[in-house]
UniProtKB/Swiss-Prot annotation:
Chief site of localization: cytoplasm
Protein name according to UniProt: Cytoplasmic phosphatidylinositol transfer protein 1
Region: Disordered, residue numbers: 267-329
GO BP: any one term: signal transduction
Length: 329
């Protein structure tokens, strides 16, 4: 298992981000979906936990086949999806990703939100005090994103909000920005396959980081669209957008079953921690196969069988009457 803690600061308050996150996830999922591909919402309903109180439980199916690299599409079923389950007791959420086609693969994300600059080094002390983890700051303004996802209108260095006056974030913006909040995400990636574990886990973390960066950039760039919304209004937007997204994707036969996740004993809850983002179309270098690799010859090109007339069947006494092949004398 590879554990990393991501810290993503936003020029918002924790309460503002609660609305912005819901809006961003719904809009992004709808934009990224098309016939046969995208994010299908299976369940989204209130949920009560005896420890954390009122929350929200969501379950989604992320259909990925055409978004997979070509090397992966060759070995997975035609209709392939990942199950996302999330439990939200904002400002604390948990999101889990599993896939029955890859039973040894999982992603587990714990998220906490605070009104600070990402300065709390002990926010996950109880959950990860004995675990070794890397801390990664994600800068929505200055970190590079994959070129195919760049939009000038969603660039925090250029964007200025008409409703809040916030924007044009420059290098070092976190030091003087008010208001500011931080999304702390403890991400555990597990791929227990000998020989591939460390490389695949590193690759998945890179994808997760890109998703977090793109999603948080969009949440801020769309602030004028959601800033005046109430919780009831964003819930209604979420409901209607999810219905439209499900219709856009279409109905799928149960071609591959996804392993059910039983609610943990501590019954966490949450919304989707991040939207889905298409993966690269080429295999990572460590999984690439040389195109001109010579074919190994482990046997002769043709196999010559002996002439049956030159073989007779001998039964030797005392050998348990087991027949043997032998050449005639």
């Amino acid at each position: 298992m590879l554990l990393k803690e991501y810290r993503i600061c936003m020029p918002l308050t924790v309460e503002e981000y609660r609305i912005g996150q819901l809006y961003m996830i719904s809009k992004h999922s709808h934009e990224q979906s098309e016939r046969g591909e995208g994010v299908e919402v299976v369940q989204n309903e209130p949920y009560e936990d005896p420890v954390h109180g009122q929350g929200q439980l969501t379950e989604k199916r992320v259909y990925l086949n055409s978004k997979l690299p070509s090397w992966a599409r060759a070995v997975v079923p035609k209709i392939f999806y990942v199950t996302e389950k999330a439990w939200n007791y904002y400002p604390y959420t948990i999101t889990e990703y599993t896939c029955s086609f890859l039973p040894k693969f999982s992603i587990h994300i714990e998220t906490k939100y605070e009104d600070n600059k990402g300065s709390n080094d002990n926010i996950f002390e109880s959950e990860a005090k004995d675990a070794e983890r890397e801390i990664c700051f994600v800068d929505i303004a200055c970190d590079e994103i994959p070129e195919r996802y760049y939009k000038e209108s969603e660039d925090p260095k250029n964007f200025v909000s008409e409703k809040t006056g916030r924007g044009q974030l420059k290098e070092g913006w976190r030091e003087a920005q008010e208001p500011i909040m931080c999304s702390y995400k403890l991400v555990a990636v597990k791929f227990e396959v000998w020989g591939l574990q460390s490389r695949v886990e590193q690759f998945v973390h890179k994808v997760v980081r890109d998703i977090l960066l793109i999603g948080h950039r969009q949440a801020f760039a769309w602030v004028d669209e959601w800033y005046d919304m109430t919780m009831d209004e964003v819930r209604e937007y979420e409901r209607t957008t999810q219905e439209a997204t499900n219709r856009k994707i279409g109905v799928f036969p149960p071609a591959i079953s996804i392993s059910d996740i039983t609610l943990p004993s501590h019954s966490h809850g949450g919304y989707s921690s991040a939207p889905s983002t298409p993966l690269a179309t080429d295999a990572p270098e460590f999984l690439s196969v040389p195109k001109d690799r010579p074919r190994k010859k482990s046997a002769p090109e043709t196999l010559t069988l002996p002439d049956p007339s030159q073989i007779c069947l001998n039964v030797q006494p005392g050998a348990g009457n087991k027949p043997s092949l032998a050449k005639p004398e």
